[in-house]
Design a protein with these regions (language model features):
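N-terminal loops that bind phosphate or other acidic moieties
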Residues: 1-130
């Protein structure tokens, strides 16, 4: 099977990140590398540089990594991690956390490239619910 784009879910809540990951695995399958990076190292609400870094490295299977965040400071922490990484194969995407993640995971499962998967996440912002 071809290398698939990885997805990292950065949330202030460990439970939220893992819950969304569980949903994505059901939708896109186990083959898509999806990692959750939620909460702080001591189990509280917040974000962790180390958790994000480890999640990106785990999700990176050679086709690039899409990083999605829930709220403001998660963006700052994820951006810092990406700036510090030697490899530049991961991108931080301004997309809705849940809808963007679902769109990205489904497309990643088809073998689409990082640019296409990123675009799917971004375009999820325009999908109306009602």
């Amino acid at each position: 099977m071809a290398q698939l784009v990885g997805i990292v879910l950065v949330s202030h809540s460990e439970r939220l990140a893992h819950g969304l990951r569980d949903m994505l695995v059901q939708v896109a399958g186990e083959e898509v590398p999806i990692e959750a990076a939620g909460g702080t190292d001591d189990g509280g609400l917040g974000t962790s540089y180390d958790r994000i870094l480890v999640a990106i490295d785990r999700a990176d299977r050679g086709a690039g990594v899409l990083v999605l965040t829930d709220l403001g400071s998660a963006v700052l922490t994820a951006r810092t991690v990406l700036e510090d990484r030697v490899a530049n194969d991961a991108v931080l995407v301004d997309a809705p956390f849940v809808e963007g993640a679902v769109a990205a995971a489904v497309l990643a499962g088809t073998g689409a490239g990082l640019e296409e998967v990123t675009q799917a996440a971004v375009e999820a912002r325009d999908v109306r619910k009602l």
